[in-house]
Amino acid sequence: MVYCTASLPLLLLLLVGLLAGEAFAEQCGRQAGGALCPGGLCCSQFGWCGSTSDYCGPTCQSQCGGVTPSPGGGVASLISQSVFNQMLKHRNDAACQAKGFYTYNAFIAAANSFNGFASVGDTATRKREIAAFLAQTSHETTGGWATAPDGPYAWGYCFLKEQGNPPDYCVPTAQWPCAPGKKYYGRGPIQISYNYNYGPAGRAIGYDLINNPDAVATDPVISFKTALWFWMTPQSPKPSCHNVITGRWTPSAADRAAGRLPGYGVITNIINGGIECGKGFNDKVADRIGFYKRYCDLLGVSYGSNLDCYNQRSFGVSTNPLAASS
């Protein structure tokens, strides 16, 4: 005889959904287009919001830190404005496209709206997450070069949007149809691209980015929120960057076979592994590590292990030799 192992609260929730029919759809996660739960609640594997272990446990999809506030007053208690300015020392340089846009207050407001960000684990873990987030996004927006004043890792957040004449980055989908005349090229700290990312990001933060993608380059809080949405949200088969840096991700046997072990390097793999990882040493990965080490030093925390992805297969490359022909 086979017994159902689902917990009673989730069974009751599913039963209510069945009785309510179309009026009671899943609330979050992949079942709801990547939506986040209100009030920082955890999103269960089934797409429901809650704060108990049924929702926030190992199978949780997003905001898995629960609703317990971090000790000491949130993100601002972990990184001061002076340290933030020292990290992003040249972001307001006259030569930087984003001059005056990326402010400390905008970062703090956006960060505090994502429950779980920099609030999981001890103080060192929380600071390390801030360092990792700002490092990865600094690489995406860097204006530095090898001989730049104060070094190449003092020039993060110099750029705001993709340069040149970028395409519209529109991949028509039923769920996220592109708006007429709108382009979904890279904008903001993570350089969010494509309608299928703008759509769920906007839904998660409560703003229509399909019809207003330029908001990512005109409203600094929205801009930071899109990057934090990407950071906090797993996109199968990839874990979230948040879960990796806070130690909540446990690699599978396939991950281990692919060289994907817990550490900063897996975050690089999540963000751009198909281009940068599994190819030996390359300057882009080294640049991401350089930012990270500098920021960890400024925050007074250790780096952890497995910083690079030089020998990691990307999440899009199978370890199964038959996969390519299947």
UniProtKB/Swiss-Prot annotation:
GN (gene name): chi1
UniProt keyword annotations, A-Z: Allergen, Antimicrobial, Carbohydrate metabolism, Chitin degradation, Chitin-binding, Disulfide bond, Glycosidase, Hydrolase, Pathogenesis-related protein, Plant defense, Polysaccharide degradation, Signal
Disulfides per UniProt: C28-C43, C37-C49, C42-C56, C60-C64, C96-C158, C170-C178, C277-C309
Pfam families in alphabetical order: Chitin_bind_1 (PF00187), Glyco_hydro_19 (PF00182)
Record-level GO BP terms: cell wall macromolecule catabolic process; chitin catabolic process; defense response to fungus; polysaccharide catabolic process
Reported function: Defense against chitin-containing fungal pathogens. Has in vitro antifungal activity against F.oxysporum inhibiting its growth and the branching of its hyphae. Has endochitinase activity, but no exochitinase or lysozyme activities.
Active site: E140
Keyword Hydrolase: yes
Reactions it catalyzes: Random endo-hydrolysis of N-acetyl-beta-D-glucosaminide (1->4)-beta-linkages in chitin and chitodextrins
Tissues and organs where the protein is expressed, per its UniProt entry: Expressed in the pulp of the fruit (at protein level). Expressed in mesocarp (at protein level).
Protein name: Endochitinase
Entry's EC annotation: 3.2.1.14
Organism of this sequence: Persea americana
Keyword Signal: yes
Gene Ontology molecular function: chitin binding; chitinase activity; endochitinase activity
InterPro entries xrefs: Chitin-bd_1, Chitin-binding_1_CS, Endochitinase-like_sf, Glyco_hydro_19, Glyco_hydro_19_cat, Lysozyme-like_dom_sf
Stretch forming the signal peptide: 1-25
Domain named Chitin-binding type-1: residues: 26-66
Protein family membership: Belongs to the glycosyl hydrolase 19 family. Chitinase class I subfamily.
